[in-house]
A protein has these predicted regions:
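Hydrophobic, well-ordered beta-alpha structural blocks that scaffold small-molecule cofactor pockets
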Residues: 1-109
């Protein structure tokens, strides 16, 4: 995985595509990278969808059917991305859903 540290690269890339507020689905190593990279930037993590509490960030259970609007939800549970994406689409959410892994791999330096 690319190293993102150094000067808020991830937040700049998200802001370029109009993303200011995100949610993360799943608490994985990718989640830890996203939290670290976005801490103190202009991009806010509004919540994480996970059954266990994540320190310092609002947590919504995976069983929830209602989600606060965000600009983008990044699914960090990459091994279950397709199933999670299909489940979330059934709720008629208005925001974009993307694989966190694919999103991060698609960033250009």
């Amino acid at each position: 995985m690319k190293t993102l540290s150094g000067g808020g690269y991830l937040s700049r890339e998200l802001l370029k595509i109009g993303v200011r507020n995100i949610a993360i689905y799943g608490n994985t190593e990718i989640t830890k990278v996203l939290v670290k990279e976005l801490n103190g930037t202009d991009v806010q993590i509004l919540y994480i969808v996970e059954n266990e509490r994540v320190e310092g960030i609002k947590t919504i259970p995976r069983s929830s059917t209602k989600f606060e609007d965000v600009d983008l939800m990044l699914v960090a549970d990459v091994s279950n991305f397709k199933q999670i994406e299909e489940k979330l689409k059934k709720f008629g959410l208005k925001f974009k859903i993307a694989s966190a892994y694919e999103f991060l791999m698609g960033l250009k330096n």
